[in-house]
Amino acid sequence: MKVKVSGEYTLAEIEVELDQQLTPDDLQPGATVLATNESTGGLERIVSHEELSRFFAVGPAGALPMPTDVVVERTLADPAFKQILQEADGKKGFDPQAEQMKIRDFLAGVTSSKMTTEQSVFHGSRSNSSASTVNRIKCPTCLVQFDAVAFQNHSCEAKPIEVAVPQQEKPHLVPTVSAPPAPLSKPASERVIRENQVRLRRYIKDEMKYDLATGIESSRKNAAKGPNECTMCDRKFVHASGLVRHMEKHALDLIPSQTSEQPHTIPAAGLHVVVKCNSCGRIFYDPQVAFRHGLIHDSEHSTMRQSPMTQVPSNRADFNELLLDGEMLIDNDPAFATSNQNTNPPKKEMFSSLILGSVLQCEFCEYIFADIAELLVHSASHVAERRFECTACDIQMNTAKEASIHFQTDCIFMREAIRSLNVTLSRYFVCNVCELKFANTDLLQEHRCTSFHYFPRLNENGKKLLLPCDFCDVNFEFAHDFLAHSEEKHLNKKKREKETRNTGAGRIRQYLCDICGKSYTQSSHLWQHLRFHQGVKPFVCQEENCDRKFTIRPDLNDHIRKCHTGERPYLCLVCGKRFLTGSVFYQHRLIHRGERRYECEECGKRFYRADALKNHQRIHTGEKPYSCLFCTKTFRQRGDRDKHIRARHSHLDANSRLMMQMQKFQLETAAAQKAQSHNPEQQDNDVAGGASTSDVPSGSGFMSTEPSVAEMQYSITPEQQEEMVCVPIDEVNNSFFMSHYMQAVPMEEDGSGQHIIVFEQPGQNMDMMSIYDQQQVGEPMHESGVPKRPAEENARVVVVKNNPTKPIFSDTYL
């Protein structure tokens, strides 16, 4: 190889044999190919592969690049690549001819190897070169190559090429590495970006997805994936269901961003110093990005100052946008630096520094702001007609919610693309408040009504917020009206249909209790229920001095918390109340949820609990099953009776309470006899059957006709109820009182084992107590001090002494 310096160029003349073919790999690093132009006779630099193929032979078959026509055809046939090209242009339509020319121009400047500052655009991987050639270093001053050891000991005394060449010829100097040549008029030379000083993004694998050297598709989707491995990322799952749930997160990732600007990386949470543009309000984490953004405002002001006649069309702006898309390196081009000097840098007054902990991001692009007013002004600049567009079917939508619904439910092409990934994407409906998923819209609307997840909307005038019903075209102003409408018109119907669906063969209660008729779905539940009938209590409390036993373990746990530990483990997160048992806590939660499951068939009123509905139904039936123990008043609820006893009878001692009970018994007996006298047919039937009311003492439990509670209540007059007061024993006729109630005590035929209750007056001696009998008043006392009736010798009288410290009745009524 001979090297000579001729005129204004440094040329490398390579001598080859006739049968030898020269490839581009035989060139040295940094070499520039010059060819003679036949028309002008001058030298011209070769920059494309097509022009280079006229002088050099094509490489071996294994290293053949993919033909340009094939790459262009595959690129235009792929919808994803079409979308990328369309976004890069920023135009609404798609021109295949123009895009084809752009792809060809781009491929003309891209090689199969990665472009760096040390390699030329035409220098590929030299597979036939030796290791010594690859590791050799060329001196930039004398252009002599050395190995690594010799280059360290090399001391160059030659003058640099820039000094050897005259100054007037310096712009025409052919550089080796540092100084790029003057730009040509061809678009391909501009896309090379001034001789490798800027490294573009690798379109070979990232965007074009084809390896130009081998023609093998290098998409990561075709890589070997496991049976439960995500095709979008490297996540692996044990079960297919986990993969399906994971792929739902990638659903919206298939829709490319509608903004051509690459999203910047926001730092982690915390306080950060940001730069704010005072012109538009945008904030930046990187000062360099803010500086480039300020040039846009300067160009806008300069454009407004220029007249339309003085504006010169140039492709330099498009070229700068291409630089922003790539990763820029250090630029040493003198011509480019001179052109940048004419552009005034943005003033410092255009920016201000802030310390922020949170930012506001536009929902339509990646811009971030610090002030809500500036964000609203920016959001209004987005055109509503083209905010979101489906890349598969070219349908345009206004909001992200519409785009998401279209992608998940309506777009057939997108579902086909997902199905090609062999992943089943479940169709679901999500609540925007709690992010719960539902299988259909009916369940979603039912959840919104019961959980108060309402979404008010403005009316046509834009002055009021209304609650629209999703099932019908009715709007409501208040939430309680909307809830009542949903429960009455829609939710009840849905629940009845759901109950009808749940009565299938799989939900039949086939385990029936022979004693009470209750049925269960599982045999274990029936076994636990039978313990109540059999009286089996296997669970014993282990606390000291406590031998309580229980049928089921939950009752034992409730007993321990209530009587020993006092623990209330069930906490309501809404109001903060705590509960002992889970059943009470569950009923309490229904209040916050607003779930009134139990409805009255008479009036339609709904309740949270079944016992509340049962108490309410007694209003319609008139039933009052809870009667006072000391008077004739009756109540519908047990709590009302207990309140009455604490208010009216808590001051009574043991004897007074017993007297009140006897007075109540007398009035009830009189009412029963009165009711029987008004029913002669029933009395005749009793006589015909061999039964007589005289055979059984009145008021006993052996009467054939027993009046109901309501009859006894109406038979006793209010005057009689007012007369039922506690009177001391000294103020009543003891002979009449004792004789009357001793006759009313039921006795067996032999009279054995029966007792007659008598009283000891407080402060009176036992020997001084007089006991009267109805038939024989003056019968003397026996020696034992216990009187006996003449016809019933074994009937004893039990003397009950008053002990105020131990009341007869439970303290619950006090």
Swiss-Prot record:
Gene3D superfamilies: Classic Zinc Finger. It comes from Drosophila melanogaster. This is Testis-specific zinc finger protein topi. Expressed in testis; primary spermatocytes. GO terms for biological process: cell differentiation; male meiotic nuclear division; positive regulation of transcription by RNA polymerase II; regulation of transcription by RNA polymerase II; spermatogenesis. Residues 691-705 have a biased composition (Polar residues). Required for male meiotic division and spermatid differentiation. Required for accumulation of aly and comr on chromatin. May function as a transcription factor. GO terms for molecular function: DNA-binding transcription factor activity; RNA polymerase II cis-regulatory region sequence-specific DNA binding; zinc ion binding. It is found in: Nucleus. Interacts with comr. Keywords: Developmental protein, Differentiation, DNA-binding, Meiosis, Metal-binding, Nucleus, Repeat, Spermatogenesis, Transcription, Transcription regulation, Zinc, Zinc-finger. Its main location: nucleus. A zinc finger (C2H2-type) spans 228-250, 275-297, 360-382, 429-453, 467-490, 511-533, 539-564, 570-592, 598-620, 626-649. It comes from the Eukaryota. InterPro entries: Znf_C2H2_sf, Znf_C2H2_type. GO terms for cellular component: chromatin; nucleus; RNA polymerase II transcription regulator complex. SUPFAM superfamilies: beta-beta-alpha zinc fingers.
